[in-house]
Design a protein with these regions (language model features):
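Small/polar-rich, solvent-exposed N-terminal microdomains that initiate assembly or binding
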Residues: 1-67, 112-123, 168-175
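Low-complexity, intrinsically disordered/propeptide-like segments
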Residues: 23, 32-33, 75, 79, ...
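Acidic-leaning, charged glycine-interspersed low-complexity segments
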Residues: 23, 47-52, 96-159
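Short, surface-exposed loop and linker segments with low hydrophobicity and enrichment for Pro/Ser/Thr
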Residues: 44-46, 59-73, 138-148
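Extracellular/virion structural assembly segments
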Residues: 69-72, 81-111
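Long, contiguous binding/interaction regions
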Residues: 162-166
């Protein structure tokens, strides 16, 4: 079963975010991560290792028909940075962190989806790999050093039901 449009967009972000947060614990895949940023902009101090999650533009998976069920694709980009004294070591550590981000999502998304949605409901169809690439370096404030950054992009393929959304709005108007 699918979920309605209103629930769908919010839940996709929440499921991906919680998939990473589940591994930020002791003995988790991401236990060494000091800063996890699940929002588009950040003005706070960042400690490394850092993972910055960006939800990108949602597009229809095939022809968009708003009269019923629609498959959508929402890419998420994760920018990862780790400091090491030697730049080559930092590069390897940053790539390793990007790999662990993908593994964290792979490990947790189905369990978290089943906890977040009503029994029998399914929203995320699958998650596919889109891109993995070095993004360059970022400057560390107050230091002459730079951190290498690696990005990994995963596409979340999910299903929403426009009609279910309309029925829910119509049914709630009398309340």
């Amino acid at each position: 079963m699918t979920v309605n449009l209103v629930t769908g967009f919010d839940k996709v972000h929440e499921i991906i975010k919680q998939s990473l947060e589940a591994e930020l614990t002791e003995n988790g895949l991401l236990e060494d991560v000091e800063t996890f940023i699940p929002v588009y902009t950040n003005e706070e101090h960042v400690d490394e290792p850092v993972v910055w999650m960006h939800q990108l533009e949602t597009i229809p998976g095939r022809q968009a028909d708003i009269s019923g069920t629609m498959e959508l694709t929402t890419p998420f980009q994760f920018n990862c940075a780790v400091y090491e004294v030697e730049i080559e070591d930092a590069n390897i550590a940053t790539q390793n962190l990007a790999n662990r981000v993908a593994l964290s999502i792979l490990k947790n998304w189905q369990t978290i989806q089943s906890q977040e949605l009503e029994p029998g409901k399914r929203m995320i169809k699958n998650i596919t790999f889109q891109r993995y690439y070095p993004l360059g370096t970022i400057e560390v404030n107050g230091k002459s050093e730079r951190l290498p950054v690696t990005g990994i992009v995963l596409e979340v393929h999910h299903i929403v039901n426009w009609q279910m959304c309309c029925r829910n709005l119509t049914n709630n108007q009398g309340d």
